């Protein structure tokens, strides 16, 4: 395949802090590359380097004569002016209303920007977190658009399902360098786990060898010491013991050289501990039974009705998912509950409720301030508690005095979450809380919220997240709001999970086959496995069509 971008020994620094170094990678025509890594690893930075918005500290990036387009994570402004026919068509398919950009929902804003990027007919399309805010239907549409895109795509994402479905190659930013893998996200994670196990075994084997040789050296040193002592004490045998001592010294030097050579040959490093994030949200506030009661609530913007005559009650301790298509009014409903927007009907909120509201916005923080200034504390103990929490959330010590504007989008979301962790809210209202968060942070947030004893209202399109954290849902559809208990996964959903598992296995087999020839040992078995997996996936697709 044709190589369109080459990165050679690329390094990047911010204020003398190394983001990544010695990055070597290539982009082939037709690739769909998923960039993964923890918050602050430099994923968005790498996109901007490829787009030529930034210059590397070292190394070079060679781009063939290609057209590039970049769709960023978030933007404060956008214009519907000068639309191309292709862009108009995508906006219609995605049902994006052509009105003031600031009046659009988070999902509608993203779809408008994606439509512009996809319609530019670029040779290389760069997408930064393209699934944030997207509902299930829009996500599936985007996956199909990318699979049939007549060009190359590099995307940053923390969405496990999306990476499995769309990516043909993974770039993982770990330990300040880049690892390339041919296959999807799940295939890479299996490969990574095997690699870490092999590395750990090699390191342990090397350490045993070092211990063995060092024990022999210590034994020889003891003999040498004894021989030297005897050479000065025993009359008549001094020369014999002196020669013996010298011979032992020579053996020690020989062993030392052998050890050094063995270490040079092996150079196995211990496995870097997994990046982890730890936090917990406590509530100590006593509350009554009801948190919220909504009666006959109707909300419309001009002639456009979002929902009408909505009635539901939420008890303290309930964990409720708010779901619906992009633009259906999920964020508007949250704002009505919080009294930030008006509506017809009655909304009662428990006056004793201590509410924390995490918005979708990442620009509403004081960007010039540092965490030290934002979480200003009078006592040394309180300041230490905040710094300890930051460390558990994956921040470095230097970021305590770093302006928030220099932080990644995911790190900004964590800063907002910190406020609610510190204030011990008994009601959390979260609007797309997993947007921008890296995978370890998402998983830890899921675990924390599943054990949270307070009331939770969450808007999210991350089905894994909602399955783990909520037990009921408010469904906004057909201008109404219906409260439902979380249902048991349907047979169709189980088929979809099986299909995804089979696709992951097929990608893993394909990755191995790509490094082999038909004459290699094991090729025939892998090729047979690939064909069998393909057959099973087609059978599942056929069943879906029948449904």
From Swiss-Prot:
It is found in: Cytoplasm. Induction: Expressed during all growth phases; expression is higher during early log phase and decreases as growth continues. Expression is dramatically increased in the presence of antibiotics virginiamycin M and lincomycin. A monocistronic operon. GO terms for molecular function: ATP binding; ATP hydrolysis activity; rRNA binding; tRNA binding. Signal peptide: none annotated. Gene3D superfamilies: P-loop containing nucleotide triphosphate hydrolases. ATP 1 binds at residues 37-44. Changing residue 129 to Q: Probably has no ATPase activity, does not confer lincomycin resistance, cells enter stationary phase at lower cell density, almost all protein is bound to ribosomes. Used for electron microscopy. One of its GO terms (biological process) is response to antibiotic. Residues 5-200, 292-504 form the ABC transporter domain. The keyword Ubl conjugation does not apply. SMART domains: AAA. Residues 193-222, 245-269, 488-543 form a coiled coil. One of its GO terms (cellular component) is cytoplasm. Residues 483-547 are annotated as: C-terminal extension (CTE). ATP 2 binds at residues 324-331. Keywords: Antibiotic resistance, ATP-binding, Coiled coil, Cytoplasm, Nucleotide-binding, Repeat, RNA-binding, rRNA-binding, tRNA-binding. Disruption phenotype: Hypersensitivity toward the antibiotics virginiamycin M and lincomycin, mildly increased sensitivity to erythromycin, clindamycin and oleandomycin. Hypersensitivity toward the antibiotics virginiamycin M, lincomycin and tiamulin, in this study has no effect on sensitivity to erythromycin, chloramphenicol or linezolid. Belongs to the ABC transporter superfamily. ABCF family. ARE2 subfamily. Binds within the E-site of the 70S ribosome, where it contacts ribosomal proteins L1, L5, L33-1, S7, S11, the 16 and 23S rRNAs and the acceptor arm of the P-site tRNA. The antibiotic resistance domain (ARD) is packed between the 23S rRNA and the acceptor arm of the P-site tRNA and inserts into the peptidyltransferase center (PTC). The C-terminal extension (CTE) contacts the small ribosomal subunit, positioned in the Shine-Dalgarno-anti-Shine-Dalgarno cavity. This is Ribosome protection protein VmlR. The gene is vmlR.
């Amino acid at each position: 395949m044709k190589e369109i971008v080459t990165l050679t020994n690329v390094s990047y620094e911010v204020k003398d802090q190394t983001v990544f170094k010695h990055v070597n990678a290539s982009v082939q025509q037709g690739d769909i590359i998923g960039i993964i890594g923890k918050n602050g690893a430099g994923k968005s930075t790498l996109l901007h380097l490829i787009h030529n918005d930034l210059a590397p500290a070292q190394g070079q990036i060679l781009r063939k004569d290609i057209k590039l387009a970049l769709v960023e994570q978030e933007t404060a402004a956008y214009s519907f002016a000068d639309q191309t026919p292709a862009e108009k068509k995508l906006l219609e398919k995605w049902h994006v209303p052509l009105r003031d950009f600031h009046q659009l929902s988070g999902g509608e804003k993203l779809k408008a920007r994606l439509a512009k990027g996809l319609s530019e007919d670029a040779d290389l399309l760069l997408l930064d977190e393209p699934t944030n805010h997207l509902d299930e239907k829009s996500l599936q549409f985007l996956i199909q658009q990318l699979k049939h895109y007549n060009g190359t795509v590099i995307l940053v994402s923390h969405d496990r399902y999306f990476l499995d479905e769309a990516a043909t190659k993974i770039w993982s930013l770990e330990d300040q360098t880049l690892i390339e893998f041919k296959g999807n996200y799940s295939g890479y994670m299996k490969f990574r786990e095997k690699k870490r196990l092999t590395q750990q075994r090699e390191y342990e084997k090397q350490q045993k060898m070092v211990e063995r040789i060092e024990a022999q050296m210590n034994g020889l040193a003891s003999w040498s010491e004894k021989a030297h002592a005897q050479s000065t004490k025993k009359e008549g045998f001094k020369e014999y013991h002196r020669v013996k001592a010298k011979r032992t010294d020579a053996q020690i030097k020989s062993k030392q050289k052998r050890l050094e050579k063995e270490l040079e040959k092996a150079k196995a490093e211990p496995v870097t501990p997994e990046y982890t994030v730890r936090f917990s949200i406590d509530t100590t506030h006593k509350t009554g039974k009801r948190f919220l009661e909504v009666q006959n609530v109707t909300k419309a913007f001009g002639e456009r009705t979002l929902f009408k005559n909505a009635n539901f009650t939420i008890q303290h301790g309930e964990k409720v998912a708010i779901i619906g298509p992009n633009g259906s009014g999920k964020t508007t409903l949250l704002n009505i509950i919080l009294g930030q927007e008006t509506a017809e009907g009655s909304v009662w909120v428990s006056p004793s409720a201590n509410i924390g509201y995490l918005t979708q916005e990442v620009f509403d923080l004081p960007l010039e301030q540092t965490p030290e200034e934002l979480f200003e504390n009078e006592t040394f103990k309180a300041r230490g508690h905040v710094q300890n929490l930051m460390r558990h959330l994956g921040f470095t010590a230097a970021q305590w005095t770093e302006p928030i504007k220099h932080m990644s989008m995911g790190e900004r979301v964590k800063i907002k979450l910190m406020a609610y962790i510190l204030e011990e809210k008994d009601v959390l209202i979260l609007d797309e809380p997993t947007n921008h968060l890296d995978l370890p942070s998402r998983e830890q947030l899921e675990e924390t919220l599943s054990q949270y004893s307070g009331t939770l209202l969450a808007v999210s399109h991350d089905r894994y997240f909602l399955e783990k954290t909520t037990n009921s849902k408010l469904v906004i559809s057909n201008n109404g709001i219906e409260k439902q208990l979380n249902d048991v996964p349907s047979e169709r959903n189980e088929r979809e999970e099986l299909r995804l598992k089979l696709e992951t296995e097929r990608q893993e087999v394909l990755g191995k086959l790509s490094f082999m020839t038909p004459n290699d040992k094991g090729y025939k078995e892998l090729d047979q496995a690939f064909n069998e997996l393909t057959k099973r996936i087609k059978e599942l697709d056929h069943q879906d069509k029948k449904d």
